[in-house]
A protein has these predicted regions:
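P-loop NTPase nucleotide-binding core
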Residues: 56-208, 271-393
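Walker A/P-loop-proximal flanking segment of P-loop NTPase domains
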Residues: 1-88, 97-100, 105
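C-terminal leucine-rich, beta-strand-based interaction scaffolds used for sensing/assembly
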Residues: 336-656
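A short beta-strand-to-loop transition that corresponds to the Sensor-1 phosphate-sensing loop
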Residues: 252-257, 468
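Conserved Walker B catalytic segment
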Residues: 184-252, 264-265
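Short linear interaction motifs
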Residues: 26-31, 35-41, 100-101, 200-202, ...
Length: 656
């Protein structure tokens, strides 16, 4: 029996919002999990990373909907020491907390009132979930008998039972929303709750009246912190600075999402003293090859497809105690990776080169490129003199070497040496190592089919750069139309994978338009920078091979440009790292790397190749220039690199 698209369906859900709040039995425990040390931590954590790296999924796993899931068997001994309360900072809602109707101080109190009601709702909801079945009420007695009379110190009309108080607070939130959205109307202003005193009193009731909750600590997880207005950040920062048991605040944010460390007092947040940063993106990338392979096998197994180690089917990915085995068992690691590579095979460099020689269109382009290079020096030679199936990789590098001024007779001599297994410059001067991949991308640049180097599980890892969502989308598109026969999924064709990589890349380029307040601008930054790198890849000499990152030279950026650069980092359009290979006497700054997921759309390398030195003035044009100025920037590089015509270049503002 054949089932089409069953395998692709396994990867259709690639956003936390699609998975819901209860992730018990579905969440693949990340390999870095033990680094969080949640049982010991009593200091706020800042979970940092780009969109798609798994922050939201992790926070939902740590929150009560999963911890106290009806699908989980709980006892007083297995009841989590920390009860997680999850809140998401909704941009549209938060921006209603401003305007001339109130002073900023009053808006801050209104915001804290709303935050208090939201946290109280989560806390009471956790108790309700813990008593949701007869068995649980027997295991955790007394929840329904809780007396919340102490809450009347803050709200005299509040009922005292759990179910009634939940309804009352829900009603209070609704009335608050009505007041918030009708500032010019007759809605009475509510009495604002004091955030920490009210919540501490509520927690006190729970801890005093329920023995099994006596030592429990409540973790408030605020997701998408970067959506807060600045005064709201100061309010949350204050809660971070003064967090202590039994109520500790944690936040998740994109890079550069914390625009201020100021609190409501003169104090500022200090790392180490007040919080610890958990760089989820960096931690995930360290073991991403194994984690991605595990996720790949797990998703397919849930669809009834036989793939990967038996340990995955037995639930090792769902267990906190299984992490050490996953990391240390080399046989398990090998079997998991091999399973993913079997379904998503890639080409070795040698196989990719042979693919070119066997393809009529690609081999024809190779001959044309060699012929063009020969005309620069000695047209008496023929392209076929340099094309040898036993030296396929080296043959692909010949056009670049000819355009660098190497003599045809010298290249032939070096090829002969290599064929005879003698010392040769293709090896000792790293000609093949330096120019093979760049030469492959150049051959494919003007063609409708994407480069085969984008295909394969290992290529998908590099394209994803630790981003789970990007990896899942690459798998989803690759497996569309793939048959499952007898419970086995077939290997995906190389060209199909490469096309899927380009389609996914186009999707994520387009998605930059929705990246916050500056989304449209970031979309144009991606298109402009992508075209500059594409032009660099189109240079016949490949003297600066595989350019995919830049450094800024010639001064500091103006504030507006610096802000946009920060947005590029926040939304993972660019990644930043300390600069390497600084030329001349210039001081070391930073390298800005193009997100590799954009590479297939522009036909460029996903590797960190050579660097482009961009003057600060050009970066300012890139970040804040008008459309015509950005076009002129691209054309200036086209002229400087002596590239005629733009027929096979993407339109600068093409819609991905």
């Amino acid at each position: 029996m054949s089932t089409t698209n069953l395998a692709a369906q396994a990867f259709a859900k690639n956003r936390a919002e699609e998975l819901g709040f209860d992730l018990w039995g579905e969440f693949v425990v990340p390999l870095y999990y033990d680094r969080l040390a949640l049982d010991e931590v009593r200091k706020p954590l800042i979970f940092e990373g780009g969109r798609g790296c798994g922050k939201t999924t992790l926070l939902r796993y740590l929150s009560h909907a999963t911890q106290l899931s009806p699908n989980r068997e709980l006892t007083p001994e297995t009841l989590p020491k920390q009860i997680g309360l999850y809140l998401r900072a909704d941009t549209q809602h938060l921006r209603t907390f401003r305007g001339e109707a109130l002073s900023e101080d009053d808006w801050q109190r209104a915001f804290e009132h709303d935050l208090c009601l939201s946290i109280a709702t989560e806390l009471l909801g956790a108790l309700q979930l813990l008593s949701s079945t007869a068995q649980r009420r027997q295991t955790f007695p007394g929840i329904e008998a809780l007396d919340f009379a102490a809450w009347r110190d803050f709200d005299a009309s509040a009922p005292t039972t759990l179910a009634a108080l939940i309804r009352h607070i829900r009603s209070a939130r609704n009335k608050f929303s009505m007041w918030l959205n009708n500032q010019d109307g007759d809605q009475p202003r509510p009495t604002f709750l004091p955030l920490r005193p009210a919540l501490i009193e509520l927690i006190g009731v729970v801890r005093e009246q329920l023995d099994f909750m006596r030592d429990r600590v409540f973790f408030v997880f605020i997701d998408e912190y970067e959506n807060l207005l600045e005064y709201q950040m100061r309010a949350v920062n204050t809660r971070l600075k003064h967090s202590e048991a039994p109520l500790i605040f944690h936040i998740a944010t994109k890079r550069n999402g914390m625009v201020t460390r100021q609190t409501l007092s003169s104090e500022q947040l200090q790392e180490r003293d007040d919080f610890r940063t958990c760089d989820i993106e960096e931690w995930a990338e360290a073991d991403f090859s194994l984690f991605a392979a595990e996720l790949f096998c797990s998703r397919l197994q849930r669809k009834g497809i036989a793939v990967g180690p038996q340990e995955i089917e037995a639930g090792i990915l769902l267990s906190l105690t299984g992490i050490k085995t996953r990391l240390d068992d080399q046989a398990y690691r090998r079997e998991t990776l091999e399973a993913a590579r079997k379904i998503l095979p890639g080409l070795s460099n040698e196989s990719a080169a042979r693919h070119v020689l066997q393809d009529k269109s690609l081999s024809g382009r190779l001959r044309d490129n060699i012929n063009t290079g020969l005309k620069l020096s000695d047209a008496s030679y023929q392209p076929d003199d340099f094309i040898r199936t036993d030296l396929a990789q080296d043959a692909l590098c010949v056009p670049a070497l000819l355009h660098q001024g190497k003599k045809p007779k010298d290249l032939l001599a070096e090829l002969e040496k290599k064929a005879a297994k003698k010392t040769n410059l293709f090896d000792t001067a790293n000609w093949t190592h330096n120019y093979f991949s760049a030469s492959m991308y150049l051959l494919f640049l003007p063609l409708p089919t994407p480069c085969v180097l984008y295909a394969g599980f290992d290529a998908f890892l590099k394209l994803s750069k630790g981003n789970t969502r990007h990896f899942l989308e690459l798998c989803h598109l690759s497996l569309q139309g793939t048959d499952v026969i007898g419970g086995q999924v077939q290997s995906v064709d190389i060209k199909t994978q490469a096309m899927a990589a380009r389609d996914a890349s186009a999707l994520f380029v387009k998605e930059t338009q929705g990246s916050g307040d500056f989304g449209n601008r970031l979309f144009h930054v991606v298109n402009t920078l992508g075209q500059v790198f594409r032009l660099s890849h189109a240079r016949p000499s490949q003297s600066e091979a595989e350019r995919t990152h830049f450094a800024i030279s010639g001064g500091d950026l103006k504030p507006d440009a610096q802000k946009l650069l920060s947005e590029c980092l926040k939304w993972s359009v660019l990644f930043v790292a300390p600069e390497t290979k600084v030329k001349g006497a210039r001081l070391e700054t930073m390298d800005y790397m193009f997100n590799p997921i954009y590479a297939p759309y522009f036909g460029i390398s996903f590797n960190k190749g050579r660097k482009l030195e961009l003057p600060a003035s050009s970066v300012e044009t890139l970040m804040t220039g008008r459309h015509e100025e950005m076009n002129a920037l691209v054309k200036s590089y086209q002229k400087a690199w002596k590239l005629d015509g733009d027929g096979d270049q993407y339109s600068l503002f093409s819609q991905a």
